[in-house]
Curated annotation (Swiss-Prot):
Protein name: Large ribosomal subunit protein uL15
GO cellular component terms attached to this protein's record: cytosolic large ribosomal subunit
GO BP annotation list: translation
Gene Ontology MF term list: rRNA binding; structural constituent of ribosome
């Protein structure tokens, strides 16, 4: 026996249903589409969100909010994530190398969440909340200004 000889056992698989192939199939003649009208025609679909001429929901509701472009190049880092950085100096580039932040990020702020495992020096261009700054300094770390 070879792979090209394999076939399912007779009766184990049902045949694909083919509408419009005779009365006996249960879906002959109109093929389950009913008589006349837009949806009976080929290509007769309506656009998503179309409500038959009534003002669609997405146009009835007001616009709101916006997407901040600042969010694209800024990131928040937890204290516990500083342990992933190799070396004693934490910079934006070292955070990128450790896959803590995205490569597009340009500004970083450290948040008070988790524990500081070791004393680290925080490089220029990295901000920190008051609590995070106090926790880093309590662990023996310092900030380069």
């Amino acid at each position: 026996m070879k792979l090209n000889d394999l076939s399912p056992a007779p009766g184990s698989r049902r045949e694909k249903h083919r509408p419009g192939r005779g009365i006996g199939s249960g879906l002959g003649k109109t093929g389950g589409r009913g008589h006349k009208g837009q949806t009976s025609r080929s290509g007769g679909t309506i656009a998503p969100g179309f409500e038959g001429g009534q003002q669609p929901l997405h146009r009835r509701l007001p616009k709101f909010g916006f997407v901040s472009l600042k969010a694209m190049d800024r990131a928040e880092v937890r204290l516990s994530e500083l342990a992933k950085v190799e070396g004693d100096i934490v910079t934006v580039q070292s955070l990128k190398d450790a896959n803590v932040i995205n490569v597009n990020v340009q500004r970083v702020k450290i948040m008070l969440s988790g524990e500081v495992a070791r004393a680290v020096t925080i490089g220029k261009g990295i901000g920190a909340t008051k609590g995070a700054r106090a926790a880093i300094e309590a662990a023996g770390g310092k900030f380069e200004e």
